[in-house]
UniProtKB/Swiss-Prot annotation:
SUPFAM superfamilies per UniProt: ARM repeat (SSF48371)
UniProt lineage: Eukaryota, Metazoa, Chordata, Craniata, Vertebrata
Biological processes per GO annotation: protein export from nucleus
Organism this protein belongs to: Danio rerio (Zebrafish)
Entries under Gene3D superfamilies matching the protein: Leucine-rich Repeat Variant
Protein name: Exportin-6
Domain Importin N-terminal: start-end pairs: 31-97
UniProt keyword list: Cytoplasm, Nucleus, Protein transport, Transport
Function text: Mediates the nuclear export of actin and profilin-actin complexes in somatic cells.
Length: 1128
């Protein structure tokens, strides 16, 4: 005994030293090795049990429990049966005797070890494990401890974190399911007992959802005073229920009384904070109570639960409800159960949105503000689950008043205290509107009756959403939203808020077009009048102009009006899609009114150029004015598809005046803004409008308009006042498309191709003049680089924009570009050492190959490829690839992309290049990337290999799939076998690498090759590679290195095994198991026997899961056996 006490003191000293801030890492390693050595000795668990029982040092207790945890989870098979029995007896006794004294995290760790033993031994060797837990739950003084054990049992036995055999996992789940009725009954009893004990008045059932006043009366039945011990107990019970509900199926065990109990506690979250006099504690103090987390802490009798702790009970109760709501698979006989849940929730929603509370001092918003934030989030989650998962089940039930529910949801939504809460509720409305739209499309016959049922609610929703985006009504709240920092979607907080709001407006528009238009247009008109009236306040003074609005109140009003006009213009643009297609004629007048107004506003902005006017508070008003002008152009651009349809209609009519006026005025609005001195936001909006007119609308007369001619002159003649690059590219694209794209509704003979071709050639000649005149050899001056990069950027964009167009457009484009392409090819070798320039050149050539390779012709294409192949030597490739993320690496990627395009060309055109491309791929690129981390280049190289195999299968296999099947096993005609084998080896090697993206990509490539070309059935693959691939994929599953791809890997395994199931089960499987280290013959036989020779995918997948899981389990068991153990 004395030696054990001495050991304990020494251990405590060591543990204290280990965690001391002054202890060096080297010393910590020494201590760790010393402890691990001692813990690993056979029978050392007795010492650790003594340490655990007799020490109050938390470090010692935690380490002791870690030793036991490791013993149970990793070495249990090798522990002697009498030692196991002693541990099963000692540890629970220790827990019962000391649980009240232990810190809660130590107590929980001890509970976890006991549950781990139960997971291994219950019921065969530890038959009273679960019954002991249930007895604790039923004991008034030990119920909390029992609930901690019960929750851990649910967590650890249903979803075991350590390896168990599949049979054991199934057994445990079945054993627990058998106990669920008893468990739920006990938990119901706990909740009911506490509720009944603390209820102030007699509780009545939930009201009918249609009763508006009963919800108020029921508020009195919620216990406002709850002692801390009861609160902690209920919190643990609800935590247990939440976890149980996450995995048990819906069944009759979830009784109405259990549901009612949960909803009783959900009411706690609805309570307002109140001032109550705390009950005196045993020592005479008064203190607010708190519920211990995770069942921790100890509650003194008489301590009461405060508002925050009551809210935690409400949150946990909502957690339970949401776990039930998540279950999409609802048996038919559970419709009544669901209805009961929704009636209870309806009641809670009434309480949350009730303005007649007993204090009569709270607005709904302030009530929600006072509630626990987590409770409101959980309640919103519930509403989302109800609408998205169960609305279709409950809508037609006469006992559930959906319209009244929507009225309450409306109040709940528009009284949210936070922007995030409001947006979460808007998401619920979006789901509801999608549901309604789908329902109407499937029931067109009674469309009107469905819409009329919800019409008033939707119009109300529309008005309120529009109100919420207006600064004149909500300036202080909207100013809180950040409009500068971009999120992962490249949106600011304000932009996200506005976008989500406008999506709701658009969904209402789809259902109620005329009502939406009549609500939106007057609001827009009001702000437009303010904007259009600004001209009268402009005062001229010599050459300068000033906006004569200076009073602070007037500036604030103007700021709000301009922000709102900007938002409403975006709303008008978002609705453009609802005026085209089949409804074009029916809604023509409304759309025409909108477009005319947008043209008027755009012209007005361009004529008086308010961005150029001096004003008070320019830092606020100038961005507002620029934004309104930009948004008017963007909204007009959104109607380009409507204008295109209008263009098609007027082609068939004599009178085109209206259409011509709209286009002429639009261009008059855009043209003055295409100037380097204009603010960039405005400039880009004008450029995008020009592109849409040229690309989408395509009026015949567009190019002849004076405003457009001015733009041509600016771009082709005025090289000294160049636009910013992005704007320059957009304008060049628009001008090019005006000349290249066919005019709609006109026959080929009236397209004026010769004239347009000549004009396009002149345009390109002007754009590329400096580029074509670059000196050779180049002077490598930075201006030369700038000319190359800027010119090729423009040309690449022009080619890309017509890549999907008709042959004539592409022919004209290539004819104009021909000289520039020749220049680019001549310059390429001269800049091979400058990756920034080479990257731009290869980007240009890649776009050319993708869009114009037919027009370029075979000979010239082959010349380009041969030039590239000769330039990219092994050394050049190595330099580029090894600088990961650099321009050099990008150059290699672009080169491989170009080769991908080439090898995908059908026919025999580029087949002579295949040997060179394969050699580059396998002999030059692959050796460099095989052992290095260069994922981008590696991904492109495997994509190229795949395309070579996929698009040029007969380069390797002369026979077709059909003839090879008909030959039924005869000799296959194969060529280039060495390259094919090398390619397959490269794919196989990639499955041994940690890169999960390459693994997924390459696995899908093999699957495509098998689907299209029967890769796995080919004789060479079947005989020499198939089992190697299966072995590698199984080993990957065993090592859990790519668990995210488990389903993909299993599907590939199935397709490979399906080549010859008989050989897989009779030959491969025994061979695979014989090669697996760490198994005995009996285990190998068991594994093979349990993998039943099924041939359907679900059964095969289950077999793969089982063999992988059980193999890992056996290895774990065998690794834990003491040396020299006789394995039977």
């Amino acid at each position: 005994m004395a030696s054990e006490e001495a050991s304990l003191r020494a251990l405590e000293s060591l543990m204290t030293e280990f965690f001391h801030s002054c202890t060096t890492n080297d010393r910590k390693r020494e201590i760790e090795e010393l402890l691990n050595s001692f813990a690993g000795q056979p029978g050392s668990w007795r010492h650790w049990l003594y340490f655990l029982s007799n020490s109050r040092n938390e470090y010692v207790m935690m380490y002791s429990l870690t030793v036991f945890e490791n013993l149970v989870n990793k070495m249990w098979v090798g522990v002697a049966s009498e030692d196991k029995a002693e541990l099963r007896s000692c540890l629970p006794k220790l827990l019962l005797s000391q649980h009240a004294l232990l810190p809660f995290f130590i107590r929980n760790k001890l509970c976890k070890v006991i549950v781990d033993i139960g997971r291994q031994d219950w019921p065969m060797f530890y038959h009273d494990f679960f019954s002991n837990t249930l007895q604790l739950v039923q004991s008034p003084s030990l119920a909390s401890l029992g609930l901690v054990l019960l929750k851990m049992t649910s967590e650890e036995l249903v979803c075991p974190r350590e390896d168990l055999s599949v049979a054991r996992k199934d057994e445990l789940k079945k054993l627990l399911l058998d106990q669920i009725p008893t468990v739920l009954n006990l938990l119901t009893r706990i909740l009911e007992t506490v509720w009944d004990k603390h209820s102030v008045t007699v509780t009545t059932p939930p009201p009918s959802p249609t009763s508006r006043e009963s919800g108020v009366m029921l508020g009195d039945s919620t216990p406002m005073v709850l002692d801390a011990e009861s609160g902690a107990l209920c919190l643990l019970a609800l935590e247990c229920l939440a976890h149980l509900f996450s995995w048990i199926p819906l069944s009759s065990s979830i009784t109405p009384s259990l549901l009612a109990s949960i909803f009783h506690f959900a009411r706690f979250g609805c309570q307002q904070p109140i001032k109550t006099k705390p009950l005196p504690t045993s020592n005479g103090d008064s203190a607010p109570g708190s519920l211990p987390a995770n069942g921790g802490g100890h509650c003194r009798t008489g301590q009461i639960v405060g508002h925050a702790e009551r809210a935690r009970l409400g949150v946990m109760a909502m957690n339970c409800i949401n776990e039930l709501m998540c279950k999409n698979c609802v048996p038919v006989d559970f419709e009544e159960f669901l209805l009961r849940m929704f009636q209870q929730t309806f009641y809670l929603l009434q309480r949350l949105t009730n303005t007649h509370s007993h204090t009569n001092t709270h607005t709904i918003k302030s009530r929600l503000q006072d509630l626990d934030e987590s409770y409101v989030e959980k309640f919103t989650d519930f509403l989302r689950l109800f609408v998205s998962v169960h609305l279709r089940r409950i809508e037609s039930n006469a006992q559930f008043p959906l319209v009244e529910f929507l009225a309450l949801l409306f109040k709940y939504t528009f009284n949210q205290p936070s922007h995030e809460g409001y947006l979460a509720c808007l998401d619920i409305w979006s789901v509801f509107l999608d549901y309604l739209t789908t329902k109407i499309r499937s029931r067109l016959a009674d469309r009107d009756s469905v819409i009329n049922r919800y019409k008033d609610a939707l119009v109300l929703l529309l008005r309120e959403v529009l109100n919420r985006i207006q600064f004149r009504l909500n300036q202080s709240q909207l100013e809180e939203l950040d409009d500068e920092t971009l999120d992962d979607d490249q949106q600011t907080e304000w932009q996200r808020y506005l976008r989500q709001s406008l999506e709701v407006v658009a969904r209402v528009m789809e259902l109620l077009p005329s009502q939406t238009f009549s609500v939106l247009f007057p609001v827009l008109q009001e702000d437009l009048d303010v904007y259009l009236g600004l001209q009268q306040f402009i005062v001229r003074s010599g050459t300068s102009r000033r906006l004569n609005i200076t009073a602070e109140a007037d500036c604030r009003k103007l700021h709000c009006a301009l922000r709102d006009l900007s938002s409403l213009l975006q709303a008008v643009g978002r609705l453009a899609e609802f005026f085209t297609g089949d409804v074009f004629t029916a809604r023509f007048n409304d759309a025409l009114a909108i477009v005319q107004r947008l043209v008027e506003v755009s012209c007005y902005g361009s004529q008086i150029s308010l961005y150029d006017v001096e004003m008070a508070v320019p830092s606020v008003l100038k961005p507002d004015l620029i934004d309104v002008h930009a948004q008017s152009l963007a909204a007009l651009q959104a109607y380009s598809h409507w204008l295109a349809q209008f263009c098609g209609e007027v082609q068939r009519q004599q009178d085109q005046t209206q259409f011509v006026d709209l286009i002429t005025s639009s261009m008059a609005a855009a043209s003055p803004l295409i100037n380097g001195k204009v603010p960039e936001k405005l400039l880009l909006s004008a450029c995008h409008l020009l592109v849409s007119m040229a690309t989408t609308v395509r009026p015949v007369f567009l190019v002849s308009l004076p405003a457009v001619q001015n733009i041509f002159n600016l771009i082709t003649e005025n090289h000294n006042h160049r636009l910013p690059q992005e704007a320059h590219v957009l304008v060049c694209r628009a001008l090019s498309n005006m000349l290249l794209l066919p005019w709609p509704s006109l026959p080929e003979g009236e397209q004026q191709w010769p004239n347009r071709s000549a004009n396009h050639a002149r345009l390109i000649s002007s754009l590329t003049q400096q580029y074509r005149l670059l000196p050779r050899p180049p002077n490598h001056h930075h201006t030369s680089k700038a000319v190359i990069q800027q010119t090729l950027c423009v040309l690449r964009d022009l080619v890309d924009s017509i890549s999907g167009e008709a042959t004539k457009s592409r022919q004209i484009c290539y004819h104009s570009l021909q000289e520039s392409v020749q220049v680019s090819l001549a310059l390429f070798p001269l800049f091979i050492q400058q990756p920034e320039v080479t990257d731009e050149m290869l980007s240009f050539f890649l776009t050319l190959f993708q869009a114009l390779r037919v027009q370029m012709g075979v000979a010239f294409t082959e010349q380009i490829i041969q030039t590239f192949l000769s330039m990219f030597t092994r050394e050049q490739l190595a330099v580029g690839i090894l600088q990961e993320g650099s321009s050099g690496s990008k150059v290699v990627q672009k080169f491989l992309k170009i080769l991908q395009v080439v090898v995908q060309e059908p026919g025999q055109t580029f087949k002579p290049l295949l040997p060179s491309i394969l050699s580059l791929c396998l002999d030059q690129v692959y050796p460099i990337v095989a052992e290095r981390s260069c994922p981008d280049v590696r991904a492109e190289m495997f994509e190229l290999l795949f395309q070579i195999l996929h698009q040029n299968w007969r380069f390797f296999f002369k026979s077709s799939v059909l003839s090879s099947v008909q030959r039924s096993g005869a000799e296959e005609l194969m060529e280039n076998q060495a390259q094919f084998t090398a390619a397959m080896q490269a794919f196989g090697q990639s499955f041994l690498q940690p890169d999960i993206h390459i693994f997924k990509q390459n696995l899908s490539y093999l699957e495509v090759l098998n689907t299209k070309h029967k890769l796995y059935h080919r004789k060479l693959f079947r005989n020499a590679m198939l089992f190697h691939f299966i072995n590698v994929l199984l080993q990957v599953l065993l090592h859990k290195s790519h668990d995210l791809l488990q389903e993909d890997i299993t599907l590939a395994l199935y397709n490979m095994a399906a080549v010859d199931f008989s050989a897989f089960y009779s030959s491969f499987l025994p061979e695979f198991l014989n090669g697996c280290q760490g198994l005995d013959p009996h285990q190998r036989t068991t594994l093979a026997r349990n993998f039943t020779p099924e041939r359907d995918l679900p059964s095969f997948s289950q077999g793969v899961y089982r063999i992988v899981n059980d193999l890992r389990f056996y290895r774990l068991c065998n690794g834990s056996l003491p040396p020299g153990t006789l394995k039977l």
